[in-house]
Each structure stands twice: as C-alpha cells, then as structure tokens.
Amino acid sequence: AGADVHDADAVADIVADADAVLSALGVPFTREPVNTYSRGAANIVAAMQSSGVTRLVVVSSTGAYPAPGRTGAPFALRLFEPVITKTIGKTVYDDIRLMESVVRDSDLDWTIVRPSGLFDLPYVTEYVAGEVDPVGAFTSRSDLADYLVALAVQRGSHDTVTVSTTADTPTMWQMIRREAFKSA
C-alpha cells in the first residue's frame, strides 16, 4: 500500500492494519530543500506508535554516511561519491540523515538498510547483507526488495545494515552514463 508521506492522516490509514512497515522513499537529486525522508519518517513513526505497529524497516543509502576507508569499494565510487553527496545530492542526503535520526530516536523495532547505488535486474542474486561494509558499489532493486521482505519478519534490535549485489553489476561508468542520459 502507499500514501503521500507528507499527509499524516493518509499515512495513519495505511499503517493502521499493518503487521510491519517497509519504507522505501525516494526523490531525485535537487538543490532545493528536501523533507520527504524526514517528514515521511516522522509521520510513519507517529502513525505506527498510535496504532501499535512496532516493526519498521527503512531504506537509507550508503551515500548518507560515506566511508572513505571503504576498501571494498571501487576507486571510481570512492572518487565520485563524496562529490555527489556534497553537491548535487547534498539536500537529499541531508534529509536522509535526518530520517535516520527520526527512526533511531523512536521506540520502534527498527532496521535501517543502506543499499549502494541502485540499479535494475529482473531477478534476485546472491547478495551480501548485514552489518558489514558493502563489497560492491551497487545494489539491484530486486536484491533490495528481497532483503527488505526478509527483514520485515525479523526483529531488528535497532540495526543499521548494508546490502550489496555481488553478481551481474554494472560498471561505475555504465551507471554514470545511465544517470546522465536518463530521460526527464
């Protein structure tokens, strides 16, 4: 189910009968202020607390907290990630960090999932997930979805985890080209 996360009443209606909430919000990079992640998280947390739903899994990003010492990341990622997170993606990543704070400050059973750069694959692969540094620069949306569903039925114990696709990933240059030539 879905709702406009800026609308607290719509979020409350969706959450009311849920066993768990999976939040996979996303907005394009912009230089304008962004509040979709943080406001959405605040509305989701409030709705969950008022309806008694306790399990929350939210999608964040490895870019929210770049790890310059990430030895498993390709050189191109270590080169471009700081540029993206401090320029064209700054307002998005600032709001993602606020979202993580809202989630962490809640009394819910939460897990924050930080995928690497997202790309499309029509199938699930053997991905790496958990409290480890991602071994790759990318995460397929299929792998992310598979992991989110698995996490929905587990207790989170306030975990922040990563997920990374290890097979059939694009190169950094293929990803840059894809993003640069996306149709608007």
Regions found by a protein language model. Name each.
Residues 7-8, 31-32, 49-55, 62-184:
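Oxidoreductase cofactor-interface core, primarily capturing Rossmann-like NAD(P)-dependent enzymes
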